[in-house]
């Protein structure tokens, strides 16, 4: 049906030009499985963020024989990312030390700065974090598209014979007419 056709189109498009995806919750079993599947099927180039030893241990325990790319804040220098975060947020009161601390201990900030600097094309997060705290770093670091004044969440529901896009059931509480109009416009563009 339409659901299967939609997924085939999306997967084929992804496989034709695999993107680097930072998985912020890189030590989570589901994220490691997702990284394996993304890499195995050529859908994307996953980059797991977190403790490399823990990620390797979990992957082995799951019987996954792959060596994912890992950015481990405890084993790698993240100075360039801290510098960039400081540049972006210093006028909002963040110190250089706080920027270093954020990229070293909060993989949502690390992944967001990686995307902002072009070291990743996208970031996947929100599985184990409280939604607002998972959304805050990307909004602070990456922001919204140039033609967007508001961020919004979109869910894609696939049924046997149809596909439904549910826009902004997660971000804007009690949106006014302007927010609804913009979210509707951008969701329609996404659906096309």
Question: Which residues are covered by each model-predicted region?
Answer:
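Anion-binding alpha/beta catalytic cores of soluble intermediary-metabolism enzymes, centered on
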Residues: 1-192
